[in-house]
A protein has these predicted regions:
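Structural motif
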Residues: 3-5, 31-34, 63-66, 79-81, ...
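A conserved acidic, glycine/proline-rich C-terminal tail/linker
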Residues: 183-243
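Active-site histidine-anchored catalytic micro-motif
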Residues: 3, 27-33, 44-50, 60-69, ...
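Fold-independent oxyanion-binding glycine-rich loops
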Residues: 8-10, 36-38, 68-71, 84-85, ...
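N-terminal glycine-rich anion-binding loop in soluble enzyme alpha/beta folds
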Residues: 2-40
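Surface-exposed interaction regions enriched in Ser/Thr/Asp/Glu
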Residues: 246-255
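Anionic-ligand-binding alpha/beta catalytic cores of soluble enzymes and soluble regulatory domains
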Residues: 116-185, 190
């Protein structure tokens, strides 16, 4: 049986996550389950998209990901099931479904086609997405879950792309983790090992390979575990040190231009 990985904004203080696990067990008894993240800020599609991108390459082949951060629940937004390479995704069509790139197959999930009761207007993670994830985990045919959808018309991912500059890139802070590290949208492979990052006219961070290379409370630039460049302070918070927040710009330049 295919494993199911869960990414939601349901939190851990209510019954929501437990009930989703119960529904998965009901429709796919014994299904292996992976809790990726249930602490996405409520309705934060941007953060959910980033966390999904970070986790995706490390999931086992055949894995079914149920990603539900769904501020449009109960509206006419589509519920989707997608095949992406050797993995599957069930998610609302609000940018999450498009966050991983083109899919080979996309269907709009139809509860009637799956023999389900009409889903709740407020908890479709339980009534629609969890049964859909279980359907795929059992090895059932994705194309029998509903009507096919052209992947070109999906709601686009909210994460911005880096803006090329003559000597580097204008990057954007796209996530701040619990350590205060500031992840940008620029892959580490986009610039050389001597690159620098500037966020004001007189504040510049040099690139290093490890946190321990930072001197004291120095803000440094390094490639994070997901492959994106981030600003960090060894043993401290880059968010506090710089005052930067998600959505702010950082200029990341090649060796011949340190910014400023």
């Amino acid at each position: 049986m295919r494993p199911v990985a869960l990414l939601t904004d349901f939190g851990l203080s209510d019954h929501y996550v437990g009930v989703v696990h119960a529904v998965l067990e009901k429709y796919a008894p014994g299904v292996p389950r992976i809790d990726l993240d249930h602490l996405v800020p409520p309705g934060d599609i941007w953060e959910a998209s980033f966390q999904l991108r970070c986790a995706w390459p490390h999931l086992p082949a055949g894995c079914v990901v149920m990603a539900v951060v769904d501020p449009g629940v109960g509206t006419d937004r589509r519920a989707l099931a997608l095949a992406l390479g050797r993995r599957f995704l069930v998610a609302p069509d609000n940018g999450l479904a498009a966050s991983l790139g083109p899919a080979s197959d996309v269907v709009e999930i139809d509860w009637r086609s799956m023999g389900l009761a009409e889903p709740s207007r407020t908890f479709q993670g339980r009534d629609l997405f969890a049964p859909a994830a279980a359907w795929l985990a059992r090895g059932e045919d994705l194309t029998q879950m509903g009507k096919e959808v052209d992947s070109d018309i999906l709601v686009s991912c909210p994460l911005p792309d880096p803006e090329p500059l003559t000597s580097g890139y204008q990057a954007t802070v796209i996530s701040v983790d619990r350590f205060g590290n500031l992840a940008t949208n620029l892959p580490g492979s986009s610039v050389d090992d001597q690159a620098k990052a500037a966020w004001t006219s007189d504040e510049v961070a040099r690139r290093v390979r490890t946190y321990s290379e930072a001197e004291g409370d120095e803000v440094v630039l390094l490639e994070g575990s997901a492959g994106f460049l981030e600003l960090a302070v060894n043993g401290g918070s880059a968010a506090m040190a710089t005052g930067l927040r998600r959505g702010d710009s950082v200029r990341i330049t090649h060796t011949d231009d340190g910014g400023g």
